[in-house]
């Protein structure tokens, strides 16, 4: 059910990719384990059918409750796919300075650090879903960049991927940003309006289409290693077990 009116048009994702092919401890991550993507809540019925036919059995929705209220769950709600709502930011409005909202690569890196510290329990649950769902798990936020990028990084760290490979995967979204912004504009515009932000003004202060996206993810990984040594320390403290990591690695390398 939606509580905010918006002209919601069903469309195919523009930032969807299987994480298969990335080098991890012991080999290469297989396809069909984890899919990162932009919003799945308003995909077309054909896309929903294709994802399920391709082995999708679980969806991890990292968006805030308000974002979910804007879109509902869409065509995938009609399929036998487990749905896990695990907001990494409970209130998007509270995560930003209303007087000086900063949408820069550096600001995103700081926000990612706050996500890992503040939403570690949700990240642990998400990793358990990926570890134990019988098929493929797809995880998404709105754009498939920030919250999705943080979960992808935690998954790849658990699998033993190198920081450079994690950053490279994250930066692939850069080529899709124009399409992402076009696809998400109606939903994000409705959300910003509901939160009391001026969407047009936010767009003018954003520099996310400029420079290198690497900065944000590199900042997160460097900070985690500097603060903890083991970048998974915040998640371990929140309950991430060696058994879950072992299960993830077993599934990631399975033929």
Q: Where do the language-model regions lie?
A:
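Cys-dependent protein tyrosine phosphatase-like superfamily
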Residues: 1-138, 150-255
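Ser/Thr-glycine-rich phosphate-binding loops at phosphate-binding pockets of nucleotides
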Residues: 143, 147-148
